[in-house]
């Protein structure tokens, strides 16, 4: 009560913050006459003048007012658009590293030009992040005209560019691209072997469009680059065939947590089925040697119980294509990892692609925290303000609309069954269509959007192809003549290519558009239709000239008339139905279910009522909807019965709205906790990733890594001596034979250690010093023999490739550790602390292994003179998603050189350095020449077995 009174008197904290920007807005407005008086050349020269001020020591804050005034005037001249005062405030919020929440249609794209231009003057590059390639191209070309007018360069990063094109785009003052492309470029850069091959030039400032979609919805989506491993398609097919034979009591399914597990009877049943099928040949299912079968069974079970065709994925062109749960978009090329995608392929009887191993990964949370300054824009951020502040240290500022919002958001209508709900939706669409009011029907999946489409067809409606010009002419003619067309369009992942055009024309009189979640669509729905889209479609072949201009003017007049018709399409008052006032015209949003997040619902509603236009929205629900069914449908059902709800009757009541809001808040809180938990664990890996990537970059930047190589060699000597001559041990306790053998194996040295140990009064320090000297002399002779310049090149390549190989193995180990560490909680130990501790020990082990591997290789390497050529990443990648977190991955193709499958450790005589100059000579009969052999490599003895099953069994490495 007191808080509400104080808010009324003093305003909210958001109001006070917005008020704080007003003086600078006034200062920018005061400069407008001066800017208008400048010639184009003089206005363009403002950029060089402002850059000079920054170079002279002024901060960007100091030049904000003149910079914003410059951009505003340039936009007026180039685009014919003038930044409103509230847009100037939005630009200031972005510049300060905050999130500007701006309603749909308020011009977020134009707002970004202000902060982008200002920060580009510092010369460190600005990254503008969008959700798809279409928006990246559109915004770069559209706003790039303003930047180009002012003398700044604009680049675009989209899928399919080569490294040279990417490097050129990143070198521009301003770069537009998608979150995936930026993240994968970062990972790929940290797999390069020369600084000159890297494409990104740093992470100074990023503006993230649809920031909630990228930093919240996709926060649990680690970007992963992976390489292929062994093909197990036969096993997937065999196990998939058994899934339909399981009974419902064989497994426990939790839809709320999206988990499924076999019951005790289910374990017995599946074991019996596996034996019948010849898959389980020996032992019990949970014996250690059958753990792979358990993994495949679990993934097949998940594929059949948790994932639904046309909701979670579609099948197209012999592929399983994932559907983004938040936007309804197809994600071609992305794949679930850990074998889940292969299980789905087996389920759908399409070609099964090979599994993959992680080579490099990072979450969006940690990628975007690399930027020195981060900002974002969206229409819906306030519901997630706490998460933005806690995770990213980003404050949310709600920017006032330029005109008041005139949309009417009606209360939800709740029905007992889905059938009753859909009948009410069709009836409502019928009524709106008869009034020529455009309707946008929002659904949660392809399956449901196509169900609505099928119902409409049963009621006499026909689907409409928006790319068919003659079909659209029918719609436009009907609008001109005041007729109804009974046509509708469907926008879902199946019609991805037509997306922008379908959305743009959803405001035509009488239009019916059925769409999966609208988050991140990025195209405004203008009442009456979209002039630019119609001109592009109808006048594509008409050359510039009077005729074209006349037709453009005619289209504008027609759309103005259509707009007036839409504005007048509201529903009149109906006192008999209890509605005393009329409902507005404009775009009518019909929601067919509530989403798990209030933010997604708000995004759907926000498609209507842009820039002060009238509009209305209403959600139709049933107790069979996913949200209602999973989160408290029993309680809700009882509530409806108490309220006297009969079959076929809807109810509208504040209790219902509150219960739904609470259910959504529960889901949001659960998802927030999951994202925080992912971040806590990923922070452990992220700290190690930073160390490895920074060290790697240092190695590449150094002209020579000889000093590092020498230190590593000395470290190996110290480790070997410490291992065989314990501290404070008597000489007779020394393992001299073991020391000599280890020195031969790891340093390729033959030294008289036994004779040294017999010398009177000799200490372990003396032996260590002699071994260091012998190793240094042996290596110096190798350098002299092969040439110092060539050895310097080989040293760097061996160091980088060894680091990459060990880091890949380390990622796999950490992933396995993370999967099982939760069991420590049973022993009353904190799994996170246990993970941190063990990950630290593993990282120390990685450092030790790096010393051994680099030293062992270089102490044996022989050079055959060939033209050196630095290894590079293969050109083709495929993306992958984690089954639980929705992880993004890039997979390298089979047979892709040093990054492809197989190979294990560095047997790079024929593999990793074959294109360079280093060749390692291994004698099959002399194990001392083998160096470090990967556990899964073919044994160098020539037996044909893997090393771990041959000589590795005796070396202690297996």
From Swiss-Prot:
Keywords: ATP-binding, Cell inner membrane, Cell membrane, Cytoplasm, Membrane, Metal-binding, Nucleotide-binding, Protein transport, Translocase, Translocation, Transport, Zinc. May bind 1 zinc ion per subunit. It is found in: Cell inner membrane; Cytoplasm. One of its GO terms (molecular function) is protein-exporting ATPase activity. InterPro entries: Helicase_ATP-bd, P-loop_NTPase, SEC_C_motif, SecA, SecA_CS, SecA_DEAD, SecA_motor_DEAD, SecA_preprotein_X-link_dom. The keyword Metal-binding applies. Monomer and homodimer. Part of the essential Sec protein translocation apparatus which comprises SecA, SecYEG and auxiliary proteins SecDF-YajC and YidC. This is Protein translocase subunit SecA. It comes from Methylobacterium sp. (strain 4-46). The lineage of its organism: Bacteria, Pseudomonadati, Pseudomonadota, Alphaproteobacteria, Hyphomicrobiales.
């Amino acid at each position: 009560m007191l808080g509400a009174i104080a808010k009324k008197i003093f305003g909210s904290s958001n109001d006070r913050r917005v008020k704080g920007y007003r003086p600078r807005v006034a200062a920018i407005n005061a400069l407008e006459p001066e800017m208008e008086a400048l010639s184009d050349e003089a206005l363009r020269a403002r950029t060089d003048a402002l850059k000079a001020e920054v170079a002279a020591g002024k901060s960007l804050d100091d030049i904000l007012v003149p910079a914003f005034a410059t951009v505003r005037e340039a936009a007026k001249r180039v685009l014919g658009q003038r930044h409103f005062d509230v847009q100037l405030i939005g630009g200031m919020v972005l510049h300060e590293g905050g999130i500007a929440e701006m309603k749909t249609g308020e011009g977020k794209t134009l707002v970004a030009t202000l902060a982008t231009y200002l920060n580009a003057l510092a010369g460190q590059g600005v990254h503008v992040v969008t959700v798809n390639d279409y928006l990246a191209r559109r915004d770069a070309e559209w706003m790039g005209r303003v930047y180009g007018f002012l003398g700044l360069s604009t680049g675009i990063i989209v899928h399919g560019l080569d490294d040279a094109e990417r490097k050129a785009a990143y070198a521009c003052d301003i770069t537009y691209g998608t979150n995936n492309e930026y993240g994968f470029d970062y990972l790929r850069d940290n797999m390069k072997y020369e600084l000159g091959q890297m494409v990104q030039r740093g992470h100074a400032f990023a503006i993230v469009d649809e920031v909630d979609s990228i930093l919240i919805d996709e926060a649990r989506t680690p970007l992963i680059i992976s390489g292929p491993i062994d093909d197990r398609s036969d096993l997937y097919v065999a196990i998939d065939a058994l899934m339909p034979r399981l009974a419902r009591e064989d497994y426990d399914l939790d839809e709320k947590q999206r988990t499924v597990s076999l019951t005790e009877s289910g374990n017995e049943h599946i074991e019996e089925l596996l034996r019948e099928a010849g898959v389980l040949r020996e032992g019990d299912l949970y014996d250690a040697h059958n753990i792979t079968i358990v993994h495949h069974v679990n993934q097949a079970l998940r594929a059949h119980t948790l994932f639904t065709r046309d909701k979670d994925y579609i099948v197209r062109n012999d592929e399983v294509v994932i559907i983004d749960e938040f936007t309804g978009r197809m994600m071609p090329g992305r794949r679930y990892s850990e074998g889940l995608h292969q299980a789905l392929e087996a389920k759908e009887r399409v070609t099964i692609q090979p599994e993959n191993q992680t080579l490099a990964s990072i979450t969006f949370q940690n990628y975007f925290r690399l930027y020195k300054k981060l900002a974002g824009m969206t229409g819906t951020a306030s519901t997630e303000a706490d998460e933005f502040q806690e995770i990213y240290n980003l404050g949310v500022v709600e920017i006032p609309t330029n005109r008041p919002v005139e949309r009417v958001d009606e209360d939800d209508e709740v029905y007992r069954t889905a059938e009753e709900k859909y009948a009410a939706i069709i009836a409502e669409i019928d009524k709106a269509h008869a009034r020529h009011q455009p309707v946008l029907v929002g659904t949660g999946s392809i399956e449901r959007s196509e169900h609505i489409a099928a119902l409409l067809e049963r009621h006499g409606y026909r689907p409409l192809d928006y790319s068919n010009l003659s079909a659209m002419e029918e719609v436009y003619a009907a609008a001109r003549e005041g007729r109804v067309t009974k046509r509708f369009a469907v926008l879902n992942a199946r019609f991805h290519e037509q997306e922008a055009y379908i959305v743009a024309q959803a405001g035509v009189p009488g239009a019916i558009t059925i769409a999966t979640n609208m988050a991140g669509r990025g195209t405004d729905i203008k009442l009456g239709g979209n002039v630019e889209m119609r001109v592009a479609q109808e006048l594509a072949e008409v050359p510039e000239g009077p005729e074209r201009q006349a037709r453009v003017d005619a289209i504008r007049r027609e759309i103005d008339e259509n707009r007036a018709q839409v504005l007048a399409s509201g529903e009149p008052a109906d006192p008999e139905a209890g509605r005393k006032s009329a409902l507005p015209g404009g775009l009518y949003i019909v929601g067919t279910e509530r989403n798990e997040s209030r933010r997604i619902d708000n995004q759907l509603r926000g498609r209507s009522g842009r820039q002060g236009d009238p509009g209305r929205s209403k959600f139709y629900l049933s107790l069979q909807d996913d949200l209602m069914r999973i989160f408290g449908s029993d309680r809700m059902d009882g509530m409806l019965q108490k309220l006297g709800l009969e079959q076929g009757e809807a109810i509208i009541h504040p209790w219902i709205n509150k219960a739904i809001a609470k259910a959504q808040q529960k889901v949001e809180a659960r998802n927030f906790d999951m994202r925080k938990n992912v971040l806590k664990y990923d922070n452990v890996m992220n700290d190690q990733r930073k160390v490895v990537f920074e060290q790697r970059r240092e190695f590449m930047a150094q002209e020579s890594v000889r000093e590092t190589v020498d230190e590593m060699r000395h470290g190996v000597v110290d480790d070997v001596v410490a291992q065989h001559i314990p501290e404070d041990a008597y000489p007779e306790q020394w393992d001299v034979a073991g020391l000599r053998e280890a020195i031969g194996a790891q340093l390729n040295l033959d030294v008289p250690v036994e004779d040294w140990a017999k010398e009177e009064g000799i200490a372990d320090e003396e032996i260590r010093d002699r071994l260091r000297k012998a190793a240094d002399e042996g290596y110096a002779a190798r350098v002299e023999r092969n040439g110092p310049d060539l050895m310097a090149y080989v040293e760097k390549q061996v160091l980088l490739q060894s680091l990459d190989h060990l880091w890949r193995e380390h990622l796999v180990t950490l992933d396995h550790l993370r999967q099982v560490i939760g069991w420590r909680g049973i022993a009353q130990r904190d799994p996170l602390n246990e993970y941190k501790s063990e990950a630290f020990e593993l990282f120390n082990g990685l450092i030790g292994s790096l010393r051994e591997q680099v030293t062992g290789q270089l102490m044996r390497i022989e050079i055959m003179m060939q033209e050196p050529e630095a290894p590079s990443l293969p050109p083709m990648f495929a993306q992958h998603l984690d089954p639980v977190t929705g992880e993004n991955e890039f997979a390298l193709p089979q047979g892709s050189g040093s990054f492809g499958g197989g190979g294990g450790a560095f047997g790079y005589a024929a593999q990793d350095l074959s294109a360079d100059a280093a060749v390692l000579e291994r004698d099959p009969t002399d194990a001392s020449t083998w160096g470090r052999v990967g556990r899964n490599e073919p044994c160098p003895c020539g037996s044909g077995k893997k090393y771990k099953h041959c000589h590795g069994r005796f070396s202690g490495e297996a």
